[in-house]
């Protein structure tokens, strides 16, 4: 099986690059890697495909990992961009390369919250990937709680409950961030 690599250009100011990338991935039966440029921002998106279990001969997008829009000139993205170098990714076969590329992209989503690209010893990589996934989920949960709290038709009591729930989720988010930092500094538990 082959992999499709595409470079796409979008108009400056377009912020839904990850969503557009997901739509483009569905157009191809092969695994795809997209480099999307929108003005000064970039997005790297990797789609892994598999054979459909329901429809014989068909392929479906199994998983999509996307960076979202980022400024490649910002210093905190330097390590991530370096990690994308061909020689630094797994070279066993094309599938291993693609899975490693996908994991590298998944780890990049933590840059915004942590302020750095998480790198760790190989023995801790799976744990780091699981923690960054949890970090993503908790960050989305905090964002969702903030949006609910800003709702115009929410009572004062409901707002207070949401605030307490949000503070607890933020505490958990900080704990996961601390655990990620420990792994990256070589002091994993």
Where are these regions (language model features)?
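Residue-identity detector for glutamine
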Residues: 1, 53-56, 91, 148
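N-terminal, leucine/charged-rich tether regions that mediate assembly and partner docking
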Residues: 1-52
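Serine/threonine-rich low-complexity intrinsically disordered regions
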Residues: 11-17, 90, 121-124, 176
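Generic structural signal of hydrophobic/aromatic residues within well-ordered alpha-helices
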Residues: 20-24, 98-101, 105, 176, ...
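Catalytic nucleotidyl-transfer cores of nucleotide-processing enzymes
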Residues: 43-64, 68
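Negatively charged, Asp/Glu-rich surface segments that serve as flexible interaction/assembly modules
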Residues: 61-152
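Alpha-helical oligomerization segments
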Residues: 122-189
């Amino acid at each position: 099986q082959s992999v499709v690599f595409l470079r796409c250009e979008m108009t400056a100011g377009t912020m839904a690059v990850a969503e557009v990338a997901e739509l483009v991935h569905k157009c191809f039966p092969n695994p795809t890697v997209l480099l999307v440029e929108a003005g000064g921002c970039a997005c790297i998106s990797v789609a892994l495909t598999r054979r459909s279990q329901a429809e014989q001969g068909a392929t479906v997008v199994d998983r999509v990992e996307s960076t979202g829009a980022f400024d490649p000139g910002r210093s905190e993205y330097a390590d991530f961009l370096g990690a994308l170098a061909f020689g630094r990714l797994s070279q066993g076969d094309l599938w291993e390369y693609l899975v490693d590329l996908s994991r590298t992209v998944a780890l990049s989503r933590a840059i915004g919250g942590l302020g750095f690209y998480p790198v760790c010893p190989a023995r801790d990589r799976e744990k780091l990937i699981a923690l960054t996934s949890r970090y993503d989920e908790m960050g989305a949960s905090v964002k969702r709680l903030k949006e609910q709290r800003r709702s115009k038709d929410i009572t004062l009591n409901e707002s207070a409950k949401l605030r307490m729930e949000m503070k607890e989720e933020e505490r958990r988010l900080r704990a996961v961030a601390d655990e990620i930092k420990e792994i990256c500094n070589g002091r994993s538990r």
